[in-house]
Amino acid sequence: MNVYTIPEVKQYLNDLITILYEKEYFSFEDTAKKYVDELLDDIITNLPIKSKRPAPKYFTDRYGKGLYYAVFPKNKRTQWYAFFRMYKESGELYYQVRHITNNHVAAQFINYD
């Protein structure tokens, strides 16, 4: 199984390091980078074994049809959501991560039923 991100997700994660540092969620830029690196590593390593749900319409309208999402808790207050598409090519299963966000931004669009 192969997990990869589209360029827009890579750019978002790079920008996230700066945002986390500048908004003082982390005192050091290196610590913010480590947090983002660990988040991405968690997604790449564990996405294939996570429970998946169909993505709400809000996300499929913006990031593509046929999306699913999986939840990646980071601490008591923050959960990250990876929105992805799955496809097979040459018998190999691929996971294309098309968007990443967290509950602080997207909670109103996620159905927790």
Where are these regions (language model features)?
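Charged, low-complexity, helix/coiled-coil-prone segments
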Residues: 25, 55-58, 85, 113
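Arg/Lys-rich, positively charged N-terminal/basic patches that mediate binding to nucleic acids
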Residues: 1-42
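Conserved short aromatic-hydrophobic micro-motifs
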Residues: 39, 46-47, 84
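Aromatic side chains
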Residues: 4, 35, 68-69, 83-84
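Enriched for short, Lys/Arg-rich terminal
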Residues: 72-113
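A short, surface-exposed loop/turn module that caps and links secondary-structure elements
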Residues: 44-75
